[in-house]
């Protein structure tokens, strides 16, 4: 292993060492003579300069610069150097000015005043000036009457034609003869020119009419499987009806399955389903087919981060639940409408059942307007497995074969007087309840129209 050589640190200059070690007396022996210019070379120059004068050659211990003028090559003359700097102004000679005459001015006498070229003063004459005017006896009255101008314009109207030109009126004379003049304008036959259809055949696929039929725009597709959405499959059936149970506990904000759901989390909590953690919004559902399946989808918005302005930042997730596969039926089954029966029909393929009992021994119940009586004696008979229609009471007996009229016990007249009697034993009322008509078994439910696209989600 090669050892790296230590980096050599630069020694301080002699001037820096002199400033710190002069006071303490710890300077190296070569620092003080160099700074104070007391080296051997300095001493030789000092002693040799007593007998030899070198001028401005600049010979010394400093760097060799050749003096102020620099080195000059041999055999050439030195060029004059031009120093840069502010140019000195030429000196201005100041001449002193001394008074040659005294500054006292003597007064001049009045007789010495000469007014040369001055205008003479004319004394003003008393009186006014005359005004010459022409004598005019006519008063200055201006004629301000309004001058009327008449403008006549003639234009030609091709629509209007004077009737006297086209067809003159017949003159009438008073001599007893009526003369009727024929019109001077004769009619000419009108020439009929057949109109030709001007058709231009063109290969351009332009509009063939003035008002073309607008085309149908393609339906926008919902981008549920883009890279911006994270795909999560939900297996809980509650996602179809009450998705709020998978996010929060008893959230009253939820209003229905076909609207967007919003959630607000005031504190840190765990969602009932980990896949719905930090969800703040569920968009409207959409039902579509995906690879042979009926798929129920919703887009959720996470609120992982929020800024000071209140804006939430988070990922968007596509939750989907596969309801059922779409497969071809193994066989076609004809469906019959379930309607009310119009006549009495019996199942001829039902199991034969012939009870060995006299119909007259069956308990008969008499229902009157006011009283209800029943015979206390009853006959118990075991029942067999019989197919009975829903619209027929179970107190009638069915028998395979054609329609059979069963004998019935004669009913009492409701107008005959009936003496009420107290029952001596327990009362058994044989009968059945009511049967709902088959047409009312399946009540009509209002179908909710679920849109196949998200109305509040950008595709």
From Swiss-Prot:
GO annotation terms (biological process): microtubule-dependent intracellular transport of viral material towards nucleus; symbiont entry into host cell; viral penetration into host nucleus
Chain span(s) of sequence motif Nuclear localization signal: 1-12, 442-450
InterPro entries xrefs: Late_L2
Keyword Phosphoprotein in record: yes
Post-translational modification (record): Highly phosphorylated.
GO cellular component: host cell; host cell endosome; host cell Golgi apparatus; host cell nucleus; viral capsid
Record's keyword terms, sorted: Capsid protein, Cytoplasmic inwards viral transport, Disulfide bond, DNA-binding, Host endosome, Host Golgi apparatus, Host nucleus, Host-virus interaction, Late protein, Microtubular inwards viral transport, Phosphoprotein, Viral penetration into host nucleus, Virion, Virus entry into host cell
Molecular-function annotations in GO: DNA binding; structural molecule activity
Disulfide partners: 21-27
Subcellular location: Virion; Host nucleus; Host early endosome; Host Golgi apparatus
Similarity remark: Belongs to the papillomaviridae L2 protein family.
Subunit structure: Interacts with major capsid protein L1. Interacts with E2; this interaction inhibits E2 transcriptional activity but not the DNA replication function E2. Interacts with host GADD45GIP1. Interacts with host HSPA8; this interaction is required for L2 nuclear translocation. Interacts with host importins KPNB2 and KPNB3. Forms a complex with importin alpha2-beta1 heterodimers via interaction with the importin alpha2 adapter. Interacts with host DYNLT1; this interaction is essential for virus intracellular transport during entry.
Biological role: Minor protein of the capsid that localizes along the inner surface of the virion, within the central cavities beneath the L1 pentamers. Plays a role in capsid stabilization through interaction with the major capsid protein L1. Once the virion enters the host cell, L2 escorts the genomic DNA into the nucleus by promoting escape from the endosomal compartments and traffic through the host Golgi network.
Protein name, per record: Minor capsid protein L2
Lineage: Viruses, Monodnaviria, Shotokuvirae, Cossaviricota, Papovaviricetes
Gene designation: L2
